[in-house]
């Protein structure tokens, strides 16, 4: 617990200052990836009155984020030029890149990262998928940070483990409705009536039903595996 608190304090001091020396300007936060992790990072950073930029390849996702956060958020299409511009300007850089079923791409090169301001912070949430920077390596809750090229790196695998009780409660709350549907409706009916649930199915009847795998079989209730099965299966 001490290590977790100490790490949070250390990062916080770098971003907003301490009780003895408060920053005279808002921190600059750059978030790479506008998915679920990126969305929540934006919320927290804006709540800390930071200047926030999110980089994402999807124009549709950027439009959505702008519709939610308005002018408070700087939403920028991700490319090599914009990535370098906003990475090197950041006080806090958050890697929130996820490619389902694959290792995270190395979006951040060492050459770009070394241009960041000394004492800046990099949090690689993608470390569970290998990390999105050439400078990333997995760390632990007991030894969470290291400095590389003058930048403080936080690359802890399984970050929710820092707050195990809270994260377990949140996971239970998120999964309970699906468990109740399975119990009340049975597998086939639950999957048939909930498209999102069906898309989360990975293996069924000896078939791989997740698209990122090569030997993929569609589980779609319309024309896939589930459409060929009796409702009592």
Regions found by a protein language model. Give the residues of each.
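Short glycine-/acidic-enriched loop or helix-start segments at secondary-structure transitions
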Residues: 41, 104-105, 132-134, 165, ...
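Adenosine-phosphate binding glycine-rich loop
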Residues: 18, 127, 132-215
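Glycine-rich phosphate/diphosphate-binding loop of Rossmann-like nucleotide-binding domains
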Residues: 18, 23-90, 95
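Rossmann-like adenosine-cofactor binding region
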Residues: 69-149
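Single conserved hydrophobic/aromatic residue that forms the stacking wall/gate
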Residues: 1-17, 22, 216-233
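Short, glycine/acidic-enriched loop or turn micro-motifs at the edges of active sites
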Residues: 59, 127-131, 223
